[in-house]
From Swiss-Prot:
GO biological process assignments: cytoplasmic translational elongation
Ranges annotated as biased composition (Basic and acidic residues): 86-97
Family indicated by similarity: Belongs to the eukaryotic ribosomal protein P1/P2 family.
Protein's recorded name: Large ribosomal subunit protein P2
CDD domains: Ribosomal_P2
Region described as Disordered: spans on this chain: 69-112
Bias-annotated ranges (Low complexity): 69-85
GO cellular component terms given for this protein: cytosolic large ribosomal subunit
Keywords: Phosphoprotein, Ribonucleoprotein, Ribosomal protein
Function: Plays an important role in the elongation step of protein synthesis.
Gene3D superfamilies: 1.10.10.1410
PTM notes: Phosphorylated.
Length: 112
């Protein structure tokens, strides 16, 4: 289902129509010049019948909160010395001296 159909449904509800019909949604989509798939609109209207938008959003938020976020936990590495050695090498490198401002001029002058 395309987001434009859900958006048109939410727009109709925000305008005060608590139970928009397929024709109401088609009018909204036609006003912006969008193509309309009537089967998709009918499926949306059927799935939202008897429910309010606020109840549907609250149910979705509850489902999202119950999902784990961040993926699975990684197992601890067996050899813990490898990352420390990499950090030592990074610290051993000295940052190169940044070029002077005059060297970066490349012949361009702001006031020429």
């Amino acid at each position: 289902m395309a987001l434009k159909y859900v958006s048109s449904y939410l727009l109709a509800v925000a305008a005060g129509n608590e139970n928009p019909s397929v024709d109401d949604l088609k009018k909204i989509l036609d006003a912006v010049g969008s193509d309309v798939d009537e089967e998709c609109l009918q499926g949306l209207v059927d799935s939202m019948s008897g429910k309010t938008v606020h109840e549907t959003i609250a149910a979705g938020m509850t489902k999202l909160q119950s999902m784990p976020a961040g993926g699975a936990a990684m197992p601890a590495a067996a050899a813990g010395g490898a990352p420390a050695a990499a950090e030592d090498k990074a610290e051993a490198k000295k940052p190169e001296a940044e070029p002077e401002e005059e060297e970066d001029d490349m012949g361009f002058s702001l006031f020429d």
